[in-house]
Amino acid sequence: YDLITTIIKTMKKLKILLFLCVVACTLTVQAQKQFTLNSPDGKLQTTITVGDKLTYDIHCDGRQILAPSPISMTLENGEVWGEKAKLAGTSGKKVDQMVPSPFYRANELRDYYNELTLRFKKDWNVEFRAYNDGIAYRFVSRSKKPFNVVDETVDYRFPSDMVASVPYVKAGKDGDYESQYFNSFENTYTTDRLSKLNKKRLMFLPLVVDAGEGVKICITESGLENYPGLYLSAAEGENRLTGQFAPYPKKTVQGGHNQLQMLVKEHEAYIA
């Protein structure tokens, strides 16, 4: 009788444990939310996942050309935009307008895209745009209080060992990224597989990754103001390119070519 009682008690415990496991797994799945944004012509698609991390991927004509890649921004107060983020709401819109371009070969350009804005608690947003020829995103603060950005996570993860054409920074020592931040942004392009890129050298933008079947991914940025430009580095043993950012200058002295440059002697513990 005691043995049967023990077995029954054990089975009850197992049922409770199994129930808790099922509940925990269900909550984990439910905690992740996915949003899909398509380009106006429907050929490009990005799926944004909100969970423990904030990630996005890119499909072109139904084929994945960028695997789920995490993005985040770390503030000086320790807050991280993009990790365990609490979604507050979403909104979307379609934009189709002409933009004046006095310094281009045409006097105006068509600005045509679909946009998805994810609003999070703690006063920040992420805006995604899907154009017919590209996907873009940016972080936006809703707070009126000033803040410093300590770091930003940019981590391009590719589904295979693709071929990339990249411009390496020529200046500075191998493996010493800080010494490479001071450069002229001039070099020829080197073409190789992601796994064979030089991991000791920074790469500047734009750079191109060949996704095959006539599709090429050009990585670049625009609308940059009061923020460091993005460098990329090759991650060890993986089909990844990770972001590197120069820290904000604290002390500068005049020097360089014909004393025309400001040389950074000390930097702050933040990037912007």
Over which residues does each language-model region extend?
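N-terminal accessory beta-strand-rich subdomains and adjacent acidic, glycine-rich linkers
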Residues: 34-272
